[in-house]
């Protein structure tokens, strides 16, 4: 026997055999296993409670022009704290009054004084800064802090809230925007919705409340350990608030699903007459193998986000991957331990209104068997119809626009949204997201002339017909000699000047993005003419730059992640065409998901069902993040569904009949898993946080499309068309690819040879 063949046989035996031993050991030593997980949770929880820091929603990326502009300000004028927290306090006088009325002005002046705390760098008084509306009713004060959002002391937040409340009590309408009061993302409702849906589906699947509770319990423990670990990490690393939320979302979804597959196999083994101990071992050795490789595909897809080199995406990916890894370990160890505690109650005490049937019973005339028989019989129409439906649903993707989330997408009536709307209505939409043009005069022979040249170009752009520039605020706004002298001294010291450009459109509008490009084009030859350079920054510019970086990183990410996952699936299924078909089907799922997201969030179709009252571009991180997460989840369903088909095929069943038998065995459990995952994601789609809402909705639709349209319609139709060729693999490749025995065939043979007992 060749060395490669001997290695493959050894690996396939060790994989399933060790998982079998792990499951049986956890069942027998259940108190030790449960105690170890409980201690780990308590220790991590205590650490998180004492050492945790705060999260933030600032998407930052080094190496892009907009970030370089902020870094330049920070380097030469650190007291300006460009990365510090900020707030906009908007005041509105009652109908028929103005803010300049004596009583109202006193209220505003008092609020400005109250806002000036030790941690505040500056407060721009609306009366002196010119931020009073034409009718005099609305004005806003811009507050800049020396601390970042993460480090902002609670005392500064309290002072901001108290000042706003005092002005409100005095008769003004007051709203606070900006990031200074950005709070933590609240998730309890989202989690409860997912858990409620999961419990109902599990109860219907297993017919037992005890059995239904076990996957929920293990998933909650896995999520708890994953999230407290991430929370503990915030004490040492600055993380986005989406990172723990994403960990919660994925941990609940995959944690319940992985436990569901092992529980289903456990009940099946018990019905075959196994002892409870051996049934637990066999369930982990067989279904557990599928869970391991399904989990690996998700982990690869999420951890692979680090190849983009984009910090916040790397954080989200690694945080999600860690939680998924914990969920896999929990399913392989804590679940069999809990099965040991529950004993026969898992398979008895059924709900009276449900039939007593095997969750994996494939011989019955179930709806799943009827469906796959129909799909296989009419395979060409099913394949064409499935692909056509996915293609039609993907049409909106062609008009997808990406942008950073802003306060315009906050819930109606929230403080941040009220402040945004008041500013947009009274000062123009662009006032909510001005562009900052930073002029670096370090290489200029005449710095003042260079700044003037940059200002002149911007003013000429503003004067053109159809210009999207509402206003240009020069670095020097006064003609007074003393002001000019002070500016010259400052320019000589800092070698830096800032020009503010107020767009005529909002921060997330396409015209504002085009304006960023136009300004950069207009400034392209400034270095050659003056020796100075101009860098464009601001919220829209940051979004444009990050979107460009994501676009460049996306192909690399796809090649690395899809390549690794396809190789893993080749080893799992001993086939070239199954992984290729799985990857192509995944592209259809992504298209449907992104198409639906554009239709709802950008076009406004059925948006009221999600609590949206306005349309907005899709959040810029969604395409690559959705691709990573959904790819992993899609491969999950591919593994769980096609594993049973291959199991039937390797046992001698003809290829087309193997598709039917394998589908009938696994369809009920896969449907339950998909519905649970959709319920979890849909719960997050109902939150107020627009980032989580968008991700939750996109994932819910993606799972719906992948599980029901792709895996249960297109896949069986395609496999029925291809027949035996679907399992083809070149002989030379077989020598190098390990046979992982995910079906547990060699495990069963070894157990029978060892004389394993049955009840």
Segments (PLM) and residue ranges:
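Membrane-embedded transmembrane helical bundles of large multi-pass transporters/channels
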Residues: 1-53, 121, 136, 144-402, ...
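Short coil/turn segments at secondary-structure boundaries
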Residues: 39, 86-87, 385-388, 435-438
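Structured non-transmembrane domains adjacent to transmembrane bundles in polytopic membrane proteins
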Residues: 63-85, 95-177, 399-607, 617, ...
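A short glycine/threonine-centered beta-strand motif
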Residues: 91-93
């Amino acid at each position: 026997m060749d060395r490669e063949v001997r290695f493959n046989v050894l690996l396939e035996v060790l994989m399933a055999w060790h998982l079998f031993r792990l499951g049986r050991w956890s069942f027998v030593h259940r108190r030790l296993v449960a105690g170890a997980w409980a201690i780990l949770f308590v220790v991590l929880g205590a650490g998180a409670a004492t050492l945790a820091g705060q999260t933030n929603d600032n998407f930052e990326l080094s190496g892009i022009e907009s970030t370089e502009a902020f870094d330049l300000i920070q380097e030469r004028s650190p007291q300006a704290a460009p990365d510090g927290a900020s707030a906009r306090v908007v005041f509105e006088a009652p109908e028929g009054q103005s803010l300049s009325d004596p009583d109202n002005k006193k209220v505003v002046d008092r609020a400005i004084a109250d806002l000036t705390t030790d941690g505040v760098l500056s407060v721009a008084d609306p009366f002196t800064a010119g931020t009073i509306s034409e009718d005099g009713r609305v004005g806003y004060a811009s507050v800049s802090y020396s601390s970042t959002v993460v480090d902002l002391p609670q005392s500064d937040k309290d002072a901001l809230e108290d000042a706003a409340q005092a002005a409100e009590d005095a008769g003004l309408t007051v709203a606070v925007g900006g990031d200074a009061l950005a709070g933590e993302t609240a998730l309890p409702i989202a989690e409860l919705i997912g858990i409620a849906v999961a419990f109902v589906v599990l109860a219907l699947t297993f017919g037992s409340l005890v059995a239904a509770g076990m996957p929920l319990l293990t998933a909650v423990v896995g999520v708890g350990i994953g999230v407290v670990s991430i929370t503990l990490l915030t004490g040492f690393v600055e993380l986005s608030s989406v990172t723990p939320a994403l960990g919660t979302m994925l941990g609940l979804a995959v944690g319940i699903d992985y436990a569901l597959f092992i529980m289903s196999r456990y009940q099946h083994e018990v019905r075959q007459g196994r002892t409870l101990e051996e049934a637990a071992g066999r369930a982990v050795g067989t279904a557990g193998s599928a869970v391991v490789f399904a989990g690996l595909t998700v982990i690869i897809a999420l951890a692979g986000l680090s190849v983009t080199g984009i910090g916040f995406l790397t954080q989200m990916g690694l945080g999600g991957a860690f939680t998924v890894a914990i969920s896999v370990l929990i399913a392989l160890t804590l679940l069999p331990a809990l099965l040991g505690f529950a004993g026969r109650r898992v398979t008895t005490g059924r709900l009276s209104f449900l039939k007593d049937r095997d969750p994996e019973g494939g011989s019955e005339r179930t709806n799943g068997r009827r469906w796959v028989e129909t799909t296989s019989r009419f395979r060409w129409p099913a394949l064409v119809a499935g692909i056509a439906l996915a293609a039609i649903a993907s049409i909106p993707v062609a008009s997808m626009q990406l942008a950073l989330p802003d306060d315009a997408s906050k819930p109606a009536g929230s403080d941040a949204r009220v402040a945004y709307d008041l500013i947009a209505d009274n000062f123009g939409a662009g006032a909510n997201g001005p562009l900052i043009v930073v002029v670096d005069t370090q290489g200029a022979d005449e710095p003042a002339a260079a700044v003037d040249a940059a200002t002149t170009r911007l003013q000429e752009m503003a004067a053109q017909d159809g210009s999207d520039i509402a206003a240009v605020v020069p670095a020097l706004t006064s003609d007074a000699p003393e002001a000019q002298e002070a500016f010259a001294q400052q320019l000589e010291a800092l070698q830096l000047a800032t020009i503010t450009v107020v767009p005529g459109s909002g921060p997330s509008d396409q015209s504002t993005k085009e304006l960023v490009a136009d300004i950069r084009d207009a400034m392209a030859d400034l270095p050659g003419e003056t020796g100075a350079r101009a860098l464009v920054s601001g919220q829209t510019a940051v979004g444009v730059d990050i979107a460009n970086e994501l676009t460049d990183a996306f192909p690399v990410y796809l090649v690395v992640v899809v390549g690794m996952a396809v190789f893993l699936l080749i080893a799992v299924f001993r086939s070239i065409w199954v992984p290729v078909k799985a990857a192509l089907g995944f592209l259809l799922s992504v298209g449907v998901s992104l198409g639906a997201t554009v239709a709802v969030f950008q076009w406004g179709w059925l948006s009221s069902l999600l609590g949206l009252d306005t349309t907005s571009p899709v959040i810029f991180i969604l395409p690559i993040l959705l691709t990573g997460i959904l790819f992993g989840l899609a491969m999950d369903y591919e593994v769980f569904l096609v594993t049973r088909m291959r199991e039937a095929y390797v046992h001698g069943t003809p290829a087309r009949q193997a598709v039917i038998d394998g589908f009938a065995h696994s369809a009920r459990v896969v449907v339950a898993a998909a519905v649970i995952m959709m319920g979890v994601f849909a719960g997050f789609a109902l939150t107020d946080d627009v980032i989580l809402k968008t991700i939750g909705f996109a994932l819910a639709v993606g799972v719906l499309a992948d599980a029901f349209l792709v895996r249960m319609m297109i896949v069986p139709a395609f496999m029925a068309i291809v027949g035996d060729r679907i399992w083809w693999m070149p002989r030379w490749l077989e020598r190098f690819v390990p046979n992982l025995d995910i079906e547990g065939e060699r495990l069963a043979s070894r157990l029978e040879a060892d004389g394993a007992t049955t009840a």
